[in-house]
């Protein structure tokens, strides 16, 4: 354990069990208060990772974890900057913890740019960012719909030569990663997935290969729709289409099949989509999804 600037404490990963649990408890409290999942899945998985590139910053008050920030290199180049997340326990807000963590993040980043997620678009996060000279760089929408009527969705036909089948762990891993990279070549997070990233998800208790649907052509995979079911909640986890087949309705055809696959197992289905991806937003709205919350990524100002 080493002291970090501005009164934060830096911890190497993987986090000790008690700190790991405290971060998850903090995130759960923030999620309840803000109406949004306050720590992304990637960030949660990094709590257990021993990757030296992950920086964990914590703030305590009266022996209780009051705030947490996570920082990782962005992109593939060492000089590209950093990205991460910052959250403060709702019972310890307006006491300087957010500002102290943000100052520690800036100190560790030096002159390199940083982007931090705030989940839920809260007034407190917006005010903190404004005081520090950070600006809104990206919005991620959470859209949702009830499960009512999912099983009644009309199933679109597939183009000739395409067939839908479930994912086969081990056999399909490499082909899936290649298609995912092509489908999300311009996406700042999803397109960087490696085999290790995929296999970390395949090892999660919620993973069900029957809910990872593949559209296969004679020359290889053409698209996929990955649904997640956990604790009665459904999620469109990832929907990807080979760019060469974009615009032909393949994404919608697979998504309808995915939604029908979780009908009867969930009360609600959520999904996340970039706010500026208007084409995808229209697709989801046409299938009954509506905007429920917004996550904001803030970019650091000049230092």
Curated annotation (Swiss-Prot):
Which residues does acetyl-CoA 2 bind? 239-241, 246-252, 277-282
Residues that, per the record, bind 1D-myo-inositol 2-(L-cysteinylamino)-2-deoxy-alpha-D-glucopyranoside = 41, 189, 228, 235, 272
Spell out where the chain crosses the membrane: none
Q: Name one Pfam family in it.
A: Acetyltransf_1
Q: What GO molecular functions are on record for this protein?
A: mycothiol synthase activity
Q: What does this protein do?
A: Catalyzes the transfer of acetyl from acetyl-CoA to desacetylmycothiol (Cys-GlcN-Ins) to form mycothiol.
Q: What's the protein name?
A: Mycothiol acetyltransferase
């Amino acid at each position: 354990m080493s002291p970090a600037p501005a009164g934060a404490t830096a911890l190497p990963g993987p986090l000790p069990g008690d700190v790991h649990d405290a971060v998850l408890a903090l995130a759960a409290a923030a999620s309840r208060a803000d109406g949004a999942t306050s720590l992304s899945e990637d960030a949660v998985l990094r709590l257990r990772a021993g990757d030296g590139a992950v920086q964990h910053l914590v703030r305590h008050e009266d022996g209780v974890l009051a705030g947490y920030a996570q920082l990782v290199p962005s992109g593939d180049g060492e000089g590209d900057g950093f990205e991460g997340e910052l959250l403060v326990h709702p019972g310890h807000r307006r006491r300087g913890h957010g500002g102290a963590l943000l100052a520690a993040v800036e100190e560790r980043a030096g002159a390199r740019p940083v982007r931090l997620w705030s989940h839920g678009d809260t007034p407190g996060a917006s005010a903190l960012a404004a005081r520090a000279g950070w600006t809104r760089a990206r919005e991620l929408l959470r859209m949702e719909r009830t499960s009512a009527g999912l099983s009644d969705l009309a199933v679109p036909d597939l183009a000739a030569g395409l067939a839908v089948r479930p994912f086969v762990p081990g056999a399909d891993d490499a082909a899936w990663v290649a298609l995912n990279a092509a489908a999300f070549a311009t996406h700042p997070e999803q397109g960087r997935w490696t085999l290790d990233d995929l296999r970390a998800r395949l090892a999660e208790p919620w993973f069900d290969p029957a809910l990872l649907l593949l559209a296969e052509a004679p020359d290889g995979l053409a698209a996929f729709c990955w649904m997640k079911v956990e604790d009665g909640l459904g999620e469109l986890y990832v929907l990807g289409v080979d760019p060469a087949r974009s615009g032909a309705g393949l994404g919608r055809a697979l998504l309808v099949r995915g939604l029908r696959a979780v009908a009867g197992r969930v009360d609600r289905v959520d999904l996340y989509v970039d706010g500026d991806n208007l084409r995808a937003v229209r697709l989801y709205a046409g299938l009954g999804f509506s905007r429920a919350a917004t996550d904001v990524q803030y970019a650091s100002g000049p230092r």
